[in-house]
């Protein structure tokens, strides 16, 4: 069955952590944008793995192709800028970025660690505006479960997403809900990237939700993110 195939894939890739890479030019990018939290290390790392690892190459994205990307979780816009700078060059390519700009539980637990929370949307929109393909990005402000019906109305029942990037709230319920709502919108052969899969709560939410319905073709764990080809 598809479920057992998925479980088999998971056990196969779970412990095979990819090499961590440092990317030249990171400093230059850091000067270009304003990011208080992390940089787009995890995505750069995943990108490197997909382009160099023999298993990863089956999942690698061709930069020049037309694609519809949807990301859940913008925060300061780091991942948004990554997609904009590297994967939106085709004139037809588009990115929809979803975030309520409220921060999530882990931020509210220790607000002193996250001074950017007060100006999150402003910081994010400022960063996105500086990115290479800013004009192809639509930021939808709201919680992913409330944006979902709007996207269903707009796009209909057929799968329409080429790349889904899931980096919203990290509790297992939110992760599972984002997975169950949005993964069916991904085209066959499309990619789903789960950030923070190395985090036990995220892993639990993803595994449970994907086991419930998904027919995944292949998957790879890149050290912190899980990339699944549908």
Language-model region placement:
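A short alpha-helical cap/connector motif
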Residues: 1-230
């Amino acid at each position: 069955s598809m479920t057992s195939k998925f479980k088999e894939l998971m056990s196969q890739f779970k412990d095979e952590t990819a090499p961590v890479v440092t990317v030249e030019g990171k400093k230059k990018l850091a000067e270009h944008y304003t990011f208080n939290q992390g940089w787009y290390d995890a995505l750069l790392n995943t990108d490197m793995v997909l382009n160099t690892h023999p298993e990863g190459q089956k999942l690698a994205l061709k930069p020049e192709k037309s694609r519809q990307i949807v990301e859940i979780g913008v925060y300061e816009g780091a991942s948004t800028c990554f997609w904009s700078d590297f994967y939106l060059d085709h004139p037809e390519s588009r990115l929809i970025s979803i975030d309520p700009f409220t921060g999530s539980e882990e931020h509210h637990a220790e607000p002193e660690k996250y001074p950017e929370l007060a100006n999150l949307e402003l910081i994010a929109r400022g960063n996105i505006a500086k990115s290479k393909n800013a004009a192809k990005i639509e930021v939808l402000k709201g919680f992913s479960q409330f944006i979902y019906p709007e996207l269903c109305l707009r796009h209909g029942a057929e799968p329409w997403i080429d790349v889904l990037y899931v980096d919203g709230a990290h509790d297992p319920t939110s992760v599972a809900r984002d997975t169950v709502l949005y993964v069916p919108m991904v085209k066959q052969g499309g990619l789903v990237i789960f950030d923070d899969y190395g985090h036990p709560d995220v892993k639990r939410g993803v595994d449970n939700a994907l086991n419930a319905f998904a027919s995944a073709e292949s998957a790879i764990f890149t050290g912190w993110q899980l990339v699944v080809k549908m």
